[in-house]
Amino acid sequence: MFYASDQLRHPETLVIGLFQKSTLNGFTKELDDKLDGHLTQLLKDGDVSAKRNRVSKVYPPAATGMKRIYFIGLGREADYSFEDTKECFARVFQQVHQDKKQEVSVLLDTFVSGEVPAADAAHALSESCLLAVYEVQDYKHKSNEPDQELKSVCAVTEEDLREVQAGLNVGAAYGQGTNSARTLVNMPGNMLTATDLASYAAELAAKYDFECEILEKDEMEELGMGGLLAVNKGSSEPPKMIVLKYQGKDQWEDVIGLVGKGITFDTGGYSIKPKTGIVGMKSDMGGAASVLGAMEIIGELRPEQNVLAVIPSTDNMISSDAMKPDDVIVSLSGKTIEILNTDAEGRLVLADGITYAKQHGASVLVDVATLTGGVIVALGNEMTGAMTNHAAFYEQVAESAKESGEPIWQLPITEKDKKRVRNSQMADLNNSPGREGHAIMAGAFIGEFAENTPWVHLDIAGTATANKATCFGPAGATGVMARTLAVLTERFTPER
């Protein structure tokens, strides 16, 4: 879909970036000459704007063979960043998509600056294009299928074509992996059970030659996965422990463990959610989707790293067999847990997932979960909450999140917080000390299972879905953290 060329071959649709106070040169000067100075006149008359994110549409003379030119304002070049490049491309391709254009050429060099080289601009182009044109799959009798879809995007450049094509390929992998995560999260709970999620993971493994292991209920019972099994007790659907292994090094060492919460629907159990809180709980497997989206990106790019993805999956339902408040369960680690809140189930399955990842060689751990409403109260819907037991590893995750445009904010875990989750007369831990510092309590609980392994917890309860459309796509699932995990995998430096 995305390809690089050093030739501008009379495209019907053209995209051009404009910096403030910039002059026409290269392909833009060549194009202006073909248009008899029409672009120069448009700029002079103010009919196109270089203001950041402003899209201007121009209808060139029929003799040129072009039907439409889209100008996107880039603002001041001195203030222009990689993240700005992605947003500008998203905005212009959102307009291109609305206009049902199928073949587009982009004058890539007009998006290049000292801070954004051609390969990075190419990455931003393909990633943002795929995110911007994504549409939610519906299940209507007469589905609103687009009659025309974007088929090809040509990045026209005078820079090194191999580097530009490589950038396009990387960006396309990131965009597609994120969109795959979005699609999983948007699926209804009756169409995406733990079994369905496991089948999806197995197909991903077959496509990218990952090792794949799907642990069944009897195997979990034999191993003693009391956290995942307890949450599953109320369900008629069997649980699955999904394990994907990517080995990019000769030796299985310096392994990045990615653990994603895979609760395919969450009623809250006997601590049942209110009617306004239960709708939308199909998205409670957002962490699992992020991990699978990241694994798709990893499969495409094949970094020289080792990755272990672990996804404990079930739904959290109510029945005569379901887990109850006051129950005491035994986790895979051997630690016992008093259940004070059956709606604090995500941390129970993550406890077993983290322990399993450690047992199978994870050197560092990142868990991703739609875990608490408390993180939304604290940080809103645009910032992911983060907690850690290791400052240096956290910095690597934070840098990856920044590069991906998926901001995170660290919340503290103090010794007093740890004491609160250890406060139980009946067990080693309790799963819900109270509402105060709720997001932190959840992180502190999970940290009891990470123990001394470098670990970062990402609570995406506020960022996994968006209530309204943005330039990066429609309302619904965002696929958040798929890109961050993939960047972390590419950039990870083990501590020696």
Curated annotation (Swiss-Prot):
Residues recorded as binding Mn(2+) 2, renumbered to this chain, are 261, 266, 284, 345
Keywords of the record, alphabetical order, are:
Aminopeptidase, Cytoplasm, Hydrolase, Manganese, Metal-binding, Protease
- Gene Ontology biological-process entries: proteolysis
Per its UniProt record, the required cofactor names are: Mn(2+)
Places the protein is found: Cytoplasm
Give yes or no: UniProt keyword Endoplasmic reticulum.
Answer: no
Q: What is a GO molecular function of this protein?
A: metalloaminopeptidase activity
Listed binding positions for Mn(2+) 1 are 266, 343, 345
Q: Which reaction does it catalyse?
A: Release of an N-terminal amino acid, Xaa-|-Yaa-, in which Xaa is preferably Leu, but may be other amino acids including Pro although not Arg or Lys, and Yaa may be Pro. Amino acid amides and methyl esters are also readily hydrolyzed, but rates on arylamides are exceedingly low; Release of an N-terminal amino acid, preferentially leucine, but not glutamic or aspartic acids
Keyword Hydrolase in record: yes
Matching Gene3D superfamilies: Leucine Aminopeptidase, subunit E, domain 1 (3.40.220.10), Zn peptidases (3.40.630.10)
Active site: residue positions: 273, 347
- PANTHER family found in the cross-reference section: CYTOSOL AMINOPEPTIDASE (PTHR11963:SF23), LEUCINE AMINOPEPTIDASE-RELATED (PTHR11963)
What protein family does this chain belong to? Belongs to the peptidase M17 family.
What NCBIfam families does the record point to?
A: PRK00913.1-2 (NF002073), PRK00913.1-4 (NF002074), PRK00913.3-5 (NF002083)
- Main function: Presumably involved in the processing and regular turnover of intracellular proteins. Catalyzes the removal of unsubstituted N-terminal amino acids from various peptides.
From the Swiss-Prot or TrEMBL record, give the protein name: Probable cytosol aminopeptidase
Q: Which species is this UniProt entry from?
A: Bacillus velezensis (strain DSM 23117 / BGSC 10A6 / LMG 26770 / FZB42) (Bacillus amyloliquefaciens subsp. plantarum)
Gene designation per UniProt: pepA
